[in-house]
């Protein structure tokens, strides 16, 4: 929900080329570093073998279309983000991105129809029906933050919340082994809590100071997310027998946090961000 808020914000007053450049540089360079890190760790620890073709295919996030599996399963969320990027890019291309009331209402109706009637069946071709409520909510929260309260934003956010609760209840099977009603209810409550938190942040009821520590912690979450699963778990499994599970988990967590900070501080902040600023500045200079 937070990333979608930022994506919608980044679409404002930008051309298609500027938006595509911004999103590409935000998503891919760090992904490449983290793919290499995961390959390095799992090759050494688990003695896994990856072909160069599989690694390069994962660099694109289109690896499944090329017949290659994910090196790390967490990449599935990035593929959902790519679809969202594409939708926003199309809206910018046609100059209708600011007509939120029209396309957001259509999207919400289609999502509700798919939730209750599994129609239209083609919806999954261009956007995930299962995660559309979260995408819609993030845009609703952005409008709430930018334009203030309105009946439209309240309807969008509340409707998205209801659909998200239904989806959380249904999708608990994907994350929990044989979940009962209690586990499904907890999943729905966690989802509702994130909605309340986003409401509090966008309405100004909770204010976070723009200090470097908060910026750094927030920025570290992306690389940390990309390396924590396969690489992190493989290290814990490999060395927990020698040092104890708890001790190994703590050490690996600290290593992952440190590496994530290094990626943010020296790669993203030091190289990628200046490159993005320069390229977008050049695109604007040439009216692209």
Language-model region placement:
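Alpha-helical transmembrane segments
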Residues: 33, 104-111, 158-161
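Hydrophobic membrane-targeting signal helices
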Residues: 7, 42, 93, 112, ...
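Membrane-interface helix-loop-helix regions
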Residues: 2, 10-12, 16, 21, ...
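Surface-exposed cleft-lining segments at the edges of enzyme active sites
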Residues: 71-76, 121-127
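Generic alpha-helical transmembrane segments of integral inner-membrane proteins
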Residues: 32, 36-40, 86, 90, ...
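Alpha-helical transmembrane segments in multi-pass integral membrane proteins
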Residues: 9-18, 65-67, 91-102, 123-255, ...
């Amino acid at each position: 929900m937070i990333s979608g808020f930022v994506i919608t914000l980044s679409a404002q007053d930008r051309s298609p080329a500027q938006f595509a450049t911004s999103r590409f540089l935000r998503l891919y360079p760090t992904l490449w570093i983290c793919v290499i890190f995961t390959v390095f760790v799992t090759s050494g620890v688990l003695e896994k073998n990856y072909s160069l073709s599989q690694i390069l295919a994962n660099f694109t996030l289109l690896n499944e279309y090329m017949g290659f599996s994910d090196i790390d399963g967490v990449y599935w969320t990035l593929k959902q983000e790519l679809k969202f990027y594409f939708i926003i890019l199309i809206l910018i291309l046609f100059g209708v991105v600011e007509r939120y009331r029209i396309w957001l209402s259509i999207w919400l109706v289609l999502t509700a129809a798919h939730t209750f009637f599994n129609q239209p069946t083609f919806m999954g071709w261009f956007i995930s029906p299962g995660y559309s409520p979260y995408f819609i909510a993030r845009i609703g929260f952005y409008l709430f933050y930018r334009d203030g309260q309105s009946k439209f934003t309240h309807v969008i956010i509340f409707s998205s919340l209801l659909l998200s609760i239904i989806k959380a209840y249904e999708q608990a099977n994907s994350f929990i082994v044989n979940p009962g009603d209690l586990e499904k209810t907890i999943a729905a409550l966690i989802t509702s809590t994130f909605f309340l938190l986003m409401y509090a942040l966008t309405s100004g009821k909770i204010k976070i100071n723009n200090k470097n520590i908060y910026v750094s912690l927030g920025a570290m979450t992306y690389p940390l997310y990309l390396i924590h699963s396969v690489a992190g778990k493989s290290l814990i499994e490999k060395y927990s027998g020698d040092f104890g599970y708890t001790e190994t988990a703590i050490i690996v967590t600290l290593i992952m946090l440190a590496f994530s900070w290094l990626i943010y501080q020296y790669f993203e902040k030091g190289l990628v961000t200046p490159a993005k600023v320069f390229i977008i500045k050049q695109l604007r200079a040439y009216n692209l």
